[in-house]
Design a protein with these regions (language model features):
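Active-site proximal beta-strand in glycosyltransferases
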Residues: 83-85, 97-126
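Short, basic, glycine/proline-bearing loop/turn elements
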Residues: 5-8, 56-61, 125-133
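Membrane-proximal helix-turn-helix segments that form the acceptor-binding/catalytic region
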Residues: 123, 129-154
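Active-site donor-binding segments of glycosyltransferases and PAPS-dependent sulfotransferases
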Residues: 27-93
């Protein structure tokens, strides 16, 4: 029997995606949870495996660490022979799928700031940082497209 893993972008805010995660945890009570960063106060009943982002100071300003998120996802070690259920709106669906594993992604929404809303996103950023952010978003689109090829099945709600 494969080990069930639930992977979620980050657990530092409460929203619709986190409600989906709670439902998945009710369905798969023995599942292990993986995430990039976790706020214990918001999610005291979940004890996830986290990325190195968890240990960076000023986690509340996680947007400043966005360029590190693809590397953080890549470095999360997933055991072989796993059933990976990702609940994702951004990064975690690109987790590296090990041998003999199945990855089903419950895609909450595409990474809109990298795809269809990038011009609106850039308008809100510092004018001097925009060229660098635009380059990062181009890289992110490439990484997102390539990473989605490792998902076996998508379930989309948005």
């Amino acid at each position: 029997m494969p080990k069930v893993l639930i992977v979620h972008d980050y657990l530092n805010q409460v929203g619709g995606g986190e409600k989906v995660l709670e439902l998945l945890l009710k369905l798969f009570i023995n599942a292990e949870v993986y995430t990039l960063t976790w706020d214990r106060k918001l999610f005291p009943k979940i004890n996830p495996k986290t990325s190195f982002i968890q240990f960076i100071p000023l986690k509340k300003r996680y947007r400043a660490y966005m360029p590190l998120f693809p590397t953080a996802v890549k470095l999360l070690k997933i055991p072989e022979n796993s059933l990976i259920l990702s609940s994702s709106h951004a990064y975690i669906k690109n987790i590296i799928k090990p041998k003999n594993s199945l990855h089903i992604c419950y895609c909450l929404t595409p990474m809109r700031y990298a795809w269809d809303s990038r011009s609106e996103y850039l308008k809100r950023e510092n004018v001097f940082l925009r060229p660098f952010i635009a380059l990062f978003l181009a890289y992110l689109r490439h990484w997102d497209k390539k990473g989605s090829e490792n998902v076996d099945y998508f379930i989309a709600i948005s």
